[in-house]
Amino acid sequence: MNIDVGRQSNGQGHETVHAGFPADQSGLSADRIQMFCSDRGRNAQGDDTSGPGSAAIRANAPRAAVDRMIAAFTSFLAQEMGVAEDVVEFDGETFWAPGSNLTPTMLEAMEMARAQGRTDLQRHAARAGLPDSSLPDGANISEIVIDPEAGQTDQVRYTVVDDFGNLINLMSAEGQVNGGAAQGLEQTMLERVVFDAEGRLLTVSFLGCALPRASRVPMIGITTEPVPLAQNQLGMNGSGEAGAAGAPVAVANAVQDRGIRQVDMPFTPSRIWEVLRDVSEAAEQ
């Protein structure tokens, strides 16, 4: 089975998710499913990889295609089994019908059709749309310790509770949240664009950027509370930007809990120290 996806995979795990779902639905082994990402020679439609929608939206198309495959082979196999079409069932692994000893898998059904020259059963296409967008929800809690003498802010605990609806692959979803939260935490604490007095950009490479470091990111506690999305036949929500979107707000709220009412990101030690000094001086007046 070949699947053409109009979004490029940049580490999101599209290959695992998009192949895993039709494998479960069709009974085919995942290693028999090949995925092509943003190949304009095969698929003229597509868009950018952004927002939490690759699996939640695009997995509906393979589902529709698998449903069409099942319907097409049900009609074909009914004739082979000598039974009425409406008694043929597909249980996720094999086709079967009362009164027949034939129990072919999807792959075996394809081979039977090929042997009879039924090339019309070798290719199936379907379109699927959604009445509404992906609507993920969740909460992020940041617990920090601030050293007022140095302005150093340490992230000691970070907890996430997310509702992504039904999950195809829990490990992949948790990886999205972990990576996004790590990027969001470092963006909040250190990452910034720096210009000199003449307006020349100084942070021109990764050597000058504060990239996330494992030593600065605590173990992130992730809990999922799935509520199936009614607008999606699969009940799925997106998860792509949940970690990165929640982290800056959670950390900013934690910093403000120290009595700091206004400070711009990133919350560098020098910036936090200056604000705490101003707060202390204002309290003494």
Predicted regions mapped to residue ranges:
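Cofactor-binding beta-sheet edge motifs in enzyme active sites
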Residues: 1-285
